[in-house]
Structures are given as C-alpha cells and as structure tokens.
Swiss-Prot record:
Keywords: Cytoplasm, Elongation factor, Protein biosynthesis. Involved in peptide bond synthesis. Stimulates efficient translation and peptide-bond synthesis on native or reconstituted 70S ribosomes in vitro. Probably functions indirectly by altering the affinity of the ribosome for aminoacyl-tRNA, thus increasing their reactivity as acceptors for peptidyl transferase. Its main location: cytoplasm. Pathway: Protein biosynthesis; polypeptide chain elongation. It is found in: Cytoplasm. The lineage of its organism: Bacteria, Pseudomonadati, Campylobacterota, Epsilonproteobacteria, Campylobacterales. One of its GO terms (cellular component) is cytoplasm. Belongs to the elongation factor P family. This is Elongation factor P.
Length: 189
C-alpha cells in the first residue's frame, strides 16, 4: 500500500486511518506565524458517511486504502437492499440502503454506477456527478410565472426533489448536479 505524507494530501484523495477508508472533502494548508506548517482536512468515511476534522503535521503519514471501484448496473430495490449487477460477469451484489446513503435518491433502474469495494466488501455507491432524470410531478405554470428567477419544487423519477425554474414542465427530462442537488438545465432529448 502507498503511504501519503502531509504534502501529498489534497481534496478528493482517498486515505485510510485506523482501518477505515475516508475521502478528503476539504483541505486547508495552515502556516502559522510561529511554529511548523500543518494541514487541516475534513474527511468523509466511506463506511458510515460521517465527516471528521483531522490535522496532519509534518512527518505524519497515512495509508492508501485497499479500495476497488467497479462499474455496475443498478437493478432494483427490494425494500431492504439495492441490487446491482456486473454487466460483464453478471455477478450480483446487494448493498443496504444505509451503506448507499445520499446516492440512493439519484438512482433509477438500469443506471450505471460505481460500486466501491474495501477489502472485497461492497461499502458504497457513487453516482455520476450529473444525471438526467424525468420530472414526474411539479406545479403547473400560470401567466407571469416565467418572470424573474423564481423556482418551484419538482419531484423526479428517482424520488428526489429539486428546485427548477418555472418554465420547465412536468414530463421533461432535466440534468441535475448530484453533489449540490441542483437543477443544471434541460436535457437535449
């Protein structure tokens, strides 16, 4: 396994501390007036989704986790577990809703996602940063609604609710940023 020092840390890097895999979500290099520089990071656990703050000083080391990402197809939710299939080997993997976390609200049947394995066990799902989803329910438009930058709530086919501009209608397919949970634009379909 690779080892990282303080200078190697950056946003998006995956590290392992005490046997738990984390992803660095925020990174700040601090150089105080007196004393040695250090790095303050916020790390998110792949196992339980909790975000922790950690400080690394010069000489501190952390390990690279034994993580493997594999592209798989989301099949269905049986109520307790979500079922995924490797499209090459047809091997199926079941992951609990708890392990999937926030990614679940963006998933629809047939979608290709990245499954994260730690030491051979499926521990999480990463959906694409931008997904195209159909609007299944939203308020109708009234004359004058298209003026200004007002928004209305819309329920998507995955069950997620996002704010959309008034000119977008029910039945249309839109592009959504899954990280921020925001409407981007209408999809070109």
């Amino acid at each position: 396994m690779a080892s990282y020092s303080m200078g190697d840390l950056k946003k998006g890097l995956k590290i392992e501390l005490d046997g738990v895999p984390y992803k660095i979500v925020e990174y700040q290099h601090v150089k105080p007036g007196k004393g040695a520089a250090f790095v303050r990071v916020k790390i998110k656990s792949f196992v339980n989704g909790k975000v922790l703050e950690k400080t690394f000083h010069a000489g501190d080391k952390c390990e690279s986790p034994n993580l493997v990402e594999k592209e798989m197809q989301y099949l269905y939710d049986d109520g307790e577990f979500c079922q995924f299939m490797d499209v090459e080997s047809y091997e199926q993997v079941a992951i609990s809703d708890e392990d999937i976390g926030e990614a679940k609200k963006w998933m629809i049947d047939g979608m290709m996602v990245q499954i994260l394995f730690h030491n051979g066990k499926a521990i999480g799902v990463e959906v694409p940063q931008v997904v195209e989803l159909k609007i299944v329910e939203t308020q109708p438009n009234f004359k004058g609604d298209t003026q200004g930058s007002n928004k209305k709530p819309a329920t998507l086919e995955s069950g997620a609710v996002v704010q959309i501009p008034f000119h977008v209608l029910e039945g249309e397919v839109i592009r959504v940023d899954t990280v921020r949970g925001e409407y981007i634009e209408r999809a070109n379909k």
